[in-house]
From Swiss-Prot:
Assembly, per entry: Part of the 50S ribosomal subunit.
Role according to the record: One of the primary rRNA binding proteins, this protein initially binds near the 5'-end of the 23S rRNA. It is important during the early stages of 50S assembly. It makes multiple contacts with different domains of the 23S rRNA in the assembled 50S subunit and ribosome.
Family stated for the protein in its record: Belongs to the universal ribosomal protein uL4 family.
Organism annotation: Methanosphaera stadtmanae (strain ATCC 43021 / DSM 3091 / JCM 11832 / MCB-3)
Protein name, as recorded: Large ribosomal subunit protein uL4
One GO molecular-function entry: rRNA binding
Gene giving rise to this polypeptide: rpl4
GO terms of biological process kind: translation
Pfam family, one: Ribosomal_L4
NCBIfam families registered for this protein in UniProt: rpl4p_arch
Keywords (A to Z) from UniProt: Ribonucleoprotein, Ribosomal protein, RNA-binding, rRNA-binding
Keyword presence, Ribosomal protein: yes
GO cellular component assignments: ribonucleoprotein complex; ribosome
Amino acid sequence: MAKINVYSLKGDITEEIELPEIFEEEYRPDVIKRAVISMQTARIQPWGTDPMAGKRTTAESFGSGRGAAMVPRVKGSSKAAFVPQAIGGRKAHPPRVNTIYHEKINKKERTLAIRSAIAATANKELVEQRGHQVSELEQIPFVIDDEIETVKTTKETREIFKDLGIMDDIVRAKKGRKIKSGKGKLRGRKYRTPKGPLVVVGNDRGISLGARNHAGVDVVEVNNINAELLAPGTHAGRLTIYTKSAIEKLGDLFQKNRS
């Protein structure tokens, strides 16, 4: 197995560890895409119109022979009703609540996708293709001491990220923040922010509080890691910072023959 350096919070090398075999997994963008889309579609809430909308009327057609279109008309009036082309009528093909949006995926396929996406975080070419700023990083993947798990303030994490050389990527995410198009702006989701570094920890002892105010940064415990965090938008190769304990747990969590 390949060996990799572990860095302190100041950016100094403290020790050397072996990478688990999961980082040698074949890159499978097709499987990764399926896993991410499965997660995205699982969040879609089915919605539809009232099945009786536009149908609450006693309108009936006069029939033929009157020199007028044979559409249902309100009794005592010539006003058309019920049909899609009438004002207040039903919709022709409305959305239905029984539509199935979720694209399911097999458990072993999902595990393969996560393994492949984890391996992609060690591929510098893929990380750069995603647009991450990695010129100051001495190695990919980047492994840091478990001490970072206890950091709880934005001020502390800012200094740590500067010392580690990943602040450039956070600045890129902050500058890339744009106002969305569409009505989402009115519904509490005005901005689109590019994804920055992902911090994978063995145990979250406060780091999520310290890192959450940095643009594009996500923190996840290794037990909860998934394909969408590793490959946002179905594109693998996210800049990922692992703690030493997270690296040690990875091999056991996603074994190759595990169902």
